[in-house]
Amino acid sequence: TPAIVTQAGARRFPRYALLLLCGIYVFSGFIGRDGWKSADMVALGIMSELVQGSAHWLQPSLMGMPANEPALLPYWLGAWGMQIAPAWSAVDFVARIPFMLLLWFAMMATWYGTYYLARHPQAQPVAFAFGGEAQPKDYARAIADGGVLAFIACLGLAQLSHETTPALAQLGFSALLYY
């Protein structure tokens, strides 16, 4: 059934508040913590072995054992981060930076994908007989803001968003497909 939304119901969510919430969510999970899950530690170990030259870049492994995940790009991103890191920086933190960017990218792609989907004429709310319905742009922004908030809520339940594992890269690239 079509939505019945007034212009007042589609008022803008403060952009700074949404960006601040997304930034806090991204940074709080990556900054000031050590790897605490075995999958996180294995991924960091594989990246470290790639940097040290102990493993082949096309067949990442940890102590001779092949990686559990058949993904290459996430390990490469972390290893490249480790390679370009200054000597004074913590290697595990630098390996997390590409994953922080992937999570931010997933949030942006979700917002824009939902925004463009909600701007479609078939997704617009019912037009009122005497006006007052939500404008397409405002309605799409409200739906996209809600979509990102729901996305963050679901990520909080899944607990994969703050790991340095291929699952986060899969999430980021899936969000790109959605966009």
Each PLM stretch: what is its role?
Residues 1-27, 140:
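Start-transfer (signal-anchor) and selected internal transmembrane alpha helices
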Residues 24-43:
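Helix-to-loop transition at the C-terminal end of transmembrane segments
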Residues 25, 43-69, 73-76, 80-83:
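Extracytosolic helix-loop segments that constitute the early lumenal/periplasmic catalytic or substrate-binding loops
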Residues 38-52, 100-103, 142-144:
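Hydrophobic alpha-helical transmembrane segments
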Residues 72, 76, 85-113, 137-145, ...:
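Loop-to-helix entry region of an early transmembrane alpha helix in multi-pass inner-membrane enzymes
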Residues 82-83, 150-159:
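Membrane-embedded alpha-helical segments in integral membrane proteins
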Residues 97-136, 148-153, 176:
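Transmembrane-helix motifs of polytopic, lipid-linked glycan transferases
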Residues 156, 169-179:
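Specific aromatic-rich, kink-prone transmembrane helix
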